[in-house]
């Protein structure tokens, strides 16, 4: 397990300004891996997302491997290694395994449980395969990471429930309208929170976005950034009937949308529902709008209450997911240890079989003699080795106890070896 090494930066350790200098696109990731391979690194994988830039490696001297990975990471900036002092992730061995498991399970993301990271990891894995830097150790790590990610998603609620105000708004819009591809969103005002919510709804699949504000130049600037059209604020009552979602954020506590305007709007819409987000602080929508049957009004406090429920659910799911990851790390360690023991077990089996055949050849017609020969030969080497081990140790008692523990485990001996031997001697003297 000591062969795994990882160096990198992420949102938990490194400021965004520094992370941004190290971001790699797919061709740059591939080129980095090719350079590492040319420098003798047999296994490597590089992951670059908005949250992290991390390079994983395996094989050879861990210190030398770490130095190579760090050199390539710093060359991206380029930045001096000293600039990363105290601001980077630097892991070895089983800690690397646990880290990768947490990444694929979305436990290391800025938004706990976000679903996109697994696809990003798989893309990085494909790039590493194409670059020729995925060996058996890396492949084993990645397959185990995908398996635990699947378990976490299926056995916990880590990805359920929105946790930000904008995500809550998007979820409510989907619940109300279903597929958002045919919906129209009207952004009334250009206050920052309103823009953020409108942008999230746009990312959720809203078909059309119209920006309308008292100051048209500001509306045009926001519309250009969001790829939206601009509506005439003077014709607001004509814009509203086409809007399935209205996000209001003009600031200053001004009343931008009243009950009477919405009553007329709903009548023209034949009471088709409208989702309204009041993003103003203080509010910009007349509270009585919520009395209208087809108007679904949420202010920021309403959205925050739903988001808090989502965060609480994810916190509980996070604890469950971390427990699953810990179990998976332990299982991975056991599996790797068992695989490492396979050659020795095969050699032991071959040795025993050779001794069995020799004993049979020397006493082909005498089972008693053959079995005595076999037992004697099988025990001779280990017995001599144990005597030499105890005699050559400065702490003979300690080595004897360790040897007894090993023998009990190897041969499932039921009691203390010393006591068993003493009992056998006593029984023999009585005979």
Curated annotation (Swiss-Prot):
Pathway: Porphyrin-containing compound metabolism; protoporphyrin-IX biosynthesis; 5-aminolevulinate from L-glutamyl-tRNA(Glu): step 1/2; Porphyrin-containing compound metabolism; chlorophyll biosynthesis. It comes from the Bacteria. GO terms for biological process: chlorophyll biosynthetic process; protoporphyrinogen IX biosynthetic process from glutamate. The record marks 99 as: Important for activity. Gene3D superfamilies: Glutamyl-tRNA reductase, N-terminal domain (3.30.460.30), NAD(P)-binding Rossmann-like Domain (3.40.50.720). It catalyses: (S)-4-amino-5-oxopentanoate + tRNA(Glu) + NADP(+) = L-glutamyl-tRNA(Glu) + NADPH + H(+). Keywords: Chlorophyll biosynthesis, NADP, Oxidoreductase, Porphyrin biosynthesis. The keyword NADP applies. Substrate binds at residues 49-52, 109, 114-116, 120. NADP(+) binds at residues 189-194. During catalysis, the active site Cys acts as a nucleophile attacking the alpha-carbonyl group of tRNA-bound glutamate with the formation of a thioester intermediate between enzyme and glutamate, and the concomitant release of tRNA(Glu). The thioester intermediate is finally reduced by direct hydride transfer from NADPH, to form the product GSA. PANTHER family: GLUTAMYL-TRNA REDUCTASE. Catalyzes the NADPH-dependent reduction of glutamyl-tRNA(Glu) to glutamate 1-semialdehyde (GSA). Possesses an unusual extended V-shaped dimeric structure with each monomer consisting of three distinct domains arranged along a curved 'spinal' alpha-helix. The N-terminal catalytic domain specifically recognizes the glutamate moiety of the substrate. The second domain is the NADPH-binding domain, and the third C-terminal domain is responsible for dimerization. Homodimer. HAMAP family: Glu_tRNA_reductase. This is Glutamyl-tRNA reductase. It comes from Rhodospirillum rubrum (strain ATCC 11170 / ATH 1.1.1 / DSM 467 / LMG 4362 / NCIMB 8255 / S1). The gene is hemA.
